[in-house]
Amino acid sequence: MQATKSQALFVNFLGNSPKWYKYAIMAFLVINPLLFFYVSPFVAGWVLVVEFIFTLAMALKCYPLQPGGLLAIQAVFIGMTSPSQVLHEIEANLEVLLLLVFMVAGIYFMKQLLLFVFTKMITKVRSKIIVSLMFCTASAFLSAFLDALTVIAVIIAVAVGFYSIYHKVASGKSFNDGHDHTSETTEQLNNEELEAFRAFLRNLLMHSGIGTALGGVCTMVGEPQNLIIAAQAHWQFGEFFLRMSPVTMPVLVAGIFTCFLVEKFKVFGYGAQLPGAVHKILTDYANHEDSHRTNQDKMKLVVQALIGVWLIAGLALHLASVGLIGLSVIILATAFNGITDEHSLGKAFEEALPFTALLAVFFAIVGVIIDQELFAPVIQWALGYEGNMQLVIFYIANGLLSMVSDNVFVGTVYINEVKAALMSGQITRDQFDLLAVAINTGTNLPSVATPNGQAAFLFLLTSAIAPLIRLSYGRMVWMALPYTIVLSIVGVMAIESGFLVDMTDVLYETQLIIHHSAKDISGAVMGH
């Protein structure tokens, strides 16, 4: 019997999502205006934030752009925020959006080189612990110069490459045959082998993701909010690194040691070994590629390596905004490697654009948080403390909010509030500088707890690889837990023990950094 029009509309609504999920989103859309108009805009704002987090948590049931987008459109429509505020948020974060559009696409054209390097890593080194440490430290190093999103895009590209090679061969095809690696119906696949390989890839992706947080917190180009904090404090690349180092260096060592421990003792879903048969396929693929590599192919790798040098130099010296450097990577890589037809170019943008749209929706929710002043009580409470305790409170408050909200937003809001406190004479300039360190480390480190806080984690969760290797929201939170605990505690101990203040004094005495005055930043442009 044919469905009625109302039934057909319900079936079409959010597509293949479970019925309970569709009902939940519909309930949210009914409840929100009632709360806003008849209870309190403040309560409605926090409920909206929780609902949006729910859509992110259910990313594998339905991509968050649609349900989150509906909630955001309604929020603007009923007056929780305004279209101009949403546009202002997007303008303030344009660099992040350009980064997603261009840098991620640029990395797509460097995949051959990356696959070559990481394949060598996996095929030449048999110890899982050493491979894990290599992926974690390589991600940390790269994230100090590249944005964490760029690095995670690299690792995702590598993981998809490995997965598709294995899937193709295990499905009875040769390396050169066309194949759909997302197909779940292939009969030749050995399920136990496939599950073990999925677990192995999950381990490497999570170690890499944590690595991006460990490296990303250290420098002003590592994360988008670092750029905003550095701009407000008028710090250059070297000074930013030195001021952060009393917290970031102990955390880096602790993070790498945690990577070793979880692999050694096979806890929290780590310790999965690469099956022998899969290792053989990847080794055979590497040998096949090496033996069939023409001079043309070799020159492609050389060009990609040179572009990689330009990429790191351009970002480290901040020669242009991140997105524009990404655009230059696209142009150079395609021009010198002969990729000139539009269809081939288009594929590079498929991975990043849905996430770019999702981030724009995210900024609408940020608009609600700002307009309804949802974080104001927390910030005023934190400013009520003094001295070292104030630093600890700011670190913890930042950390808790970064676990549930985007850390770019949290860092931006806090640094502006602290700057306002400096301008009104509530705090000294030296205390402002210490608070900037507490805010930066607080937004970057505890936020690894959930995909909501780290844009790189959210990108991983909503990427094409996540469903293939069964990486769900809950599993990411569980696998990140040992890191969350260690990074958060080591970070707070570095501040609470007075180590940050003492080491900062040493840096002043040795004249590696200088005392700034409040006048320096009175003219700085506010991020929001």
Curated annotation (Swiss-Prot):
Keywords: Antiport, Cell inner membrane, Cell membrane, Ion transport, Membrane, Sodium, Sodium transport, Transmembrane, Transmembrane helix, Transport. The keyword Translocase does not apply. The chain crosses the membrane at residues 28-50, 67-87, 98-118, 140-160, 240-260, 305-325, 350-370, 391-411, 449-469, 476-496. It comes from the Bacteria. The keyword Transmembrane helix applies. It is a multi-pass membrane protein. It is found in: Cell inner membrane. GO terms for cellular component: plasma membrane. GO terms for molecular function: sodium:proton antiporter activity. It catalyses: 2 Na(+)(in) + 3 H(+)(out) = 2 Na(+)(out) + 3 H(+)(in). Na(+)/H(+) antiporter that extrudes sodium in exchange for external protons. PANTHER family: NA(+)_H(+) ANTIPORTER NHAB (PTHR43302:SF1), TRANSPORTER ARSB-RELATED (PTHR43302). HAMAP family: NhaB. Belongs to the NhaB Na(+)/H(+) (TC 2.A.34) antiporter family. This is Na(+)/H(+) antiporter NhaB. The lineage of its organism: Bacteria, Pseudomonadati, Pseudomonadota, Gammaproteobacteria, Alteromonadales.
